[in-house]
Amino acid sequence: MKLTIFKSLYFQVLTAITLGVLLGHFYPDIGAQMKPLGDGFVKLIKMIIAPVIFCTVVTGIAGMESMKAVGRTGAIALLYFEIVSTIALLIGLLIVNLVQPGAGMNIDPGTLDAKAVAVYAEQAQQQGIVPFLLDIIPGSVIGAFASGNILQVLLFAVLFGFALHRLGDKGQLIFNVIESFSRVIFGIINMIMRLAPLGAFGAMAFTIGKYGVGSLLQLGQLIACFYLTCILFVVVVLGSIARANGFSIFKFVRYIKEELLIVLGTSSSESVLPRMLDKMEKLGCKKSVVGLVIPTGYSFNLDGTSIYLTMAAVFIAQATNTHMDVIHQVTLLVVLLLSSKGAAGVTGSGFIVLAATISAVGHLPLAGLALILGIDRFMSEARALTNLVGNGVATVVVAKWCKQLDEKQLHDTLSNKPGSGADKTLPSA
């Protein structure tokens, strides 16, 4: 029994995170030098994301009986994303107005170092709904795979899947080849995941070593408020959605506990995307639904990022004594409904979208971003964790609404019954 615990990925990653925190705190210089370990692991995962999405989506769509079902799944998923992410934005706005973590700081924007956020402001100028939509279309198929752009790969995979489906029996050979290639890809993922503890250790040691615990204490009220809001959103909002669709949010969180720990260590929900695709299938969701909902959700269903954006923007206004009436806050909400859709599930993207939003609203001081910059890394963990749970719940819900969910397998797996999907997931180590 003890040996089984030591071999579990959950235990290994938890131990690695703890060691990373200790190293970063007591030996910050050494901890800061551990960054390549975390970066290397995330790069290994990114290397495999494009082929995983391609194989999953193509085999899922090509294997469906009707193409109308694919269109229906996509429409339902986008509707769900819009409703839930809007709720997340509203909850963030409500809590930050009630708690007011920035009130009383009385910071003069002119005294802040705007140079520190200049690079983010420059990137933010490139944000916009039209450039975002045009960017979904790749310049070339090879370019989409080379850059690892999730939505570009997804678009090509959907078109490829449709074309393969129309070939019928003539395309069976290609279908079999892609399915076999998919098995090889997931074999590679299994090997990469053995390095997850090392990646989590390096990323956490770097974060604590570079930014220190002091930066946590300095703006602790905002961080605590944000973390509690994310917990509230998962338990109350996602919990209610899960319950209404026949499963427990707590059992679901337990099911993906290893993925949550990896995300906690790396601060990026993208680091477990391939593994989530596999686990959601094991949970009883059809491959076609998983292949569409999970990758799309990484741009359109970022609940944690939505909460962060409203809270951070209003916090800057409170800290700099910038008055925001109802009209200003409604304007902020409308802008965020568009700009938040461009925040991919990678570390730092939320901060860039925040910069874009503040630039678009115009009422808030852009220099106020310097207040958030020092603690953004610590807030990214809660963002990524909430995003991951949100996308997992969305997949189950959309699968159920589209009648593409094996509910018996869902309940057996979440209850950890022998022979269920819970004991068929990728080996840990």
From Swiss-Prot:
Entry-linked PROSITE patterns: NA_DICARBOXYL_SYMP_1, NA_DICARBOXYL_SYMP_2
Subcellular location(s) of the protein: Cell inner membrane
Its membrane topology: Multi-pass membrane protein
Key words, A-Z: Cell inner membrane, Cell membrane, Membrane, Symport, Transmembrane, Transmembrane helix, Transport
HAMAP family assigned: C4_dicarb_transport
TM stretches of this protein: 3-23, 44-64, 76-96, 142-162, 184-204, 222-242, 326-346, 352-372
Family stated for the protein in its record: Belongs to the dicarboxylate/amino acid:cation symporter (DAACS) (TC 2.A.23) family.
Gene Ontology biological process terms from the UniProt entry: L-aspartate transmembrane transport
One cellular component (GO) term of this entry: plasma membrane
NCBIfam families registered for this protein in UniProt: PRK01663.1, PRK13027.1
Descriptive protein name: C4-dicarboxylate transport protein
Recorded GO MF terms: fumarate transmembrane transporter activity; malate:proton symporter activity; succinate transmembrane transporter activity
Purpose of the protein: Responsible for the transport of dicarboxylates such as succinate, fumarate, and malate from the periplasm across the membrane.
Pfam families associated with the record: SDF
Organism encoding this protein: Serratia proteamaculans (strain 568)
InterPro entries the UniProt entry points to: C4_dicarb_transport, Na-dicarboxylate_symporter, Na-dicarboxylate_symporter_CS, Na:dicarbo_symporter_sf
Lineage, broadest ranks: Bacteria, Pseudomonadati, Pseudomonadota, Gammaproteobacteria, Enterobacterales
